[in-house]
């Protein structure tokens, strides 16, 4: 299982999902609800559209929207063997492991360290580039 906002898909997202897929037989991705994105600006792309795009990526078996009230609800329902975090995701691994343990979920938490190196491997950088090129028109 992997999670993320996945706003404006870029090569970094693809690398993350490819590496996550290597860790199990099936990759289910939880796409963050707009309401729950707090650590960065709200997504540009609507949540259902982000979910559909993520699900279309060949490494992803299924993409679902997260729960608006309890981020652990889909995890409790799906009971994954592994939860994969990206190199830049804002989760404290120890906190996440402890919260999973409290809920009697025995799943491994793995942080993917592989990072795609490209000029626009960030949704924020893509937005900045668009504004530079077209913002004044």
From Swiss-Prot:
Residue positions annotated to bind ATP are: 5-6, 10-13, 88
- According to its UniProt record, the EC number is 2.7.7.2
Q: Which named protein is this?
A: FAD synthase
Molecular function GO labels: ATP binding; FMN adenylyltransferase activity
State the gene name recorded for this protein: ribL
Coiled-coil blocks: none
Instruction: Tell me the pathway.
Output: Cofactor biosynthesis; FAD biosynthesis; FAD from FMN: step 1/1
Catalysed reactions listed for this entry? FMN + ATP + H(+) = FAD + diphosphate
Pfam family of the protein (one)? CTP_transf_like
Q: Which SUPFAM superfamilies match?
A: Nucleotidylyl transferase (SSF52374)
Q: Show the InterPro entries listed in the entry.
A: Archaeal_FAD_synthase (IPR050385), Cyt_trans-like (IPR004821), FAD_synth_RibL (IPR024902), Rossmann-like_a/b/a_fold (IPR014729)
One Gene Ontology term from the biological process aspect of the record: FAD biosynthetic process
User: What is the protein's quaternary organization?
Assistant: Homodimer.
Q: What function does the entry list?
A: Catalyzes the transfer of the AMP portion of ATP to flavin mononucleotide (FMN) to produce flavin adenine dinucleotide (FAD) coenzyme.
Q: Which family does it belong to?
A: Belongs to the archaeal FAD synthase family.
> Keywords for this entry?
ATP-binding, FAD, Flavoprotein, FMN, Nucleotide-binding, Nucleotidyltransferase, Transferase
The prosthetic group or cofactor this protein requires is:
a divalent metal cation
Superkingdom assignment: Archaea
């Amino acid at each position: 299982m992997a999670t993320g906002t996945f706003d404006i898909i870029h090569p970094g997202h693809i690398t993350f999902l490819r590496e996550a897929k290597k860790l199990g037989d099936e990759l289910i991705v939880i796409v963050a609800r707009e309401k729950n994105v707090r650590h960065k600006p709200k997504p540009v792309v609507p949540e259902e559209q982000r979910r559909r795009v993520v699900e279309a990526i060949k490494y992803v078996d299924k993409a679902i929207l997260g729960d608006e009230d309890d981020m652990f609800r889909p995890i409790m329902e799906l009971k994954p063997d592994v939860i994969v975090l990206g190199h830049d995701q804002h989760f404290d691994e120890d906190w996440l492991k402890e919260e999973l343990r409290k809920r009697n979920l025995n799943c491994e938490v793995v942080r993917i360290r592989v990072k795609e190196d490209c000029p626009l491997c960030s949704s924020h950088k893509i937005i900045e580039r668009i504004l530079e090129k077209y913002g004044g028109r």
